[in-house]
């Protein structure tokens, strides 16, 4: 199968309409052609600045437009971020993502962000940030500091976008992705399923992503987490089989990309997650929260990986580091005696 950048909505809908087993089987064949079998890359995300976001994204509890239980927090100190990164690495994560609830970063914040990137790199983790829209100059600064990935989701199709967000345009998002790519960083970009969009809109989202000049290196597929106080708190639930189909479609359309199972995983049982892995998922967020919404805890993840015979990737393996299978065994063994979850970690729909 060739890597394409000329998909149409009609083609994608035809994929989505295939018998479920045929679609998942095809996706797994593509996965094994382009990806390493039985491996899942593990990322941890920390909210480095929480709440009071001026954007009006209807799904987001961090928006200042809605009354939710999310408290406003200032930008974290660099040392606190690095402490969290060390704990993430010790827990088995290979990439550390830092998210800030901004429309865009201010110039006064850039020195702190650059120090965070350099510090996390020194710890031995890949780095990712999601800071809202960035200029070409800011992208260059982030890249120069060593940022590996920048997350900026398209969220949905261009046609449905205005129903969800009005404070930034679809083109604003595409421009940010262009700045990221031009600066030499890798792109993390996906969308959210379950916001009231149509089948056409779901197909349109993946067409936009797959028809970029270069596919995103990471494609997070989020299932809406309905939060009280947001306009989408009463949105209709997503059918699990429809969601798994979309994972398979993403794998087939973007075979070289990591397809990440992101927000909404807390509500998925082990069987649904296993089918997502079968359909082509090979990356997850790991830990107690997804920015401000629940996520399966790390022990549950490691136990599931062990049941499935899946090992998490390590970015840089030093001679004295614990081997992957030993890490899985160690975490599984300490489930019963583990202390309370550390609320320092957050996982996000990125």
Swiss-Prot record:
Pfam families: BATS (PF06968), Radical_SAM (PF04055). It catalyses: (4R,5S)-dethiobiotin + (sulfur carrier)-SH + 2 reduced [2Fe-2S]-[ferredoxin] + 2 S-adenosyl-L-methionine = (sulfur carrier)-H + biotin + 2 5'-deoxyadenosine + 2 L-methionine + 2 oxidized [2Fe-2S]-[ferredoxin]. Pathway: Cofactor biosynthesis; biotin biosynthesis; biotin from 7,8-diaminononanoate: step 2/2. Transmembrane segments: none annotated. Binds 1 [4Fe-4S] cluster. The cluster is coordinated with 3 cysteines and an exchangeable S-adenosyl-L-methionine. InterPro entries: Aldolase_TIM, BATS_dom, Biotin_synth/BioAB, Biotin_synthase, Elp3/MiaA/NifB-like_rSAM, rSAM. The keyword Ubl conjugation does not apply. [2Fe-2S] cluster binds at residues 97, 128, 188, 260. Residues 38-256 form the Radical SAM core domain. Keywords: 2Fe-2S, 4Fe-4S, Biotin biosynthesis, Iron, Iron-sulfur, Metal-binding, S-adenosyl-L-methionine, Transferase. Its cofactor is [4Fe-4S] cluster; [2Fe-2S] cluster. SUPFAM superfamilies: Radical SAM enzymes (SSF102114). GO terms for biological process: biotin biosynthetic process. GO terms for molecular function: 2 iron, 2 sulfur cluster binding; 4 iron, 4 sulfur cluster binding; biotin synthase activity; iron ion binding. Its EC number is 2.8.1.6. Homodimer. Belongs to the radical SAM superfamily. Biotin synthase family. This is Biotin synthase. It comes from Aliivibrio salmonicida (strain LFI1238).
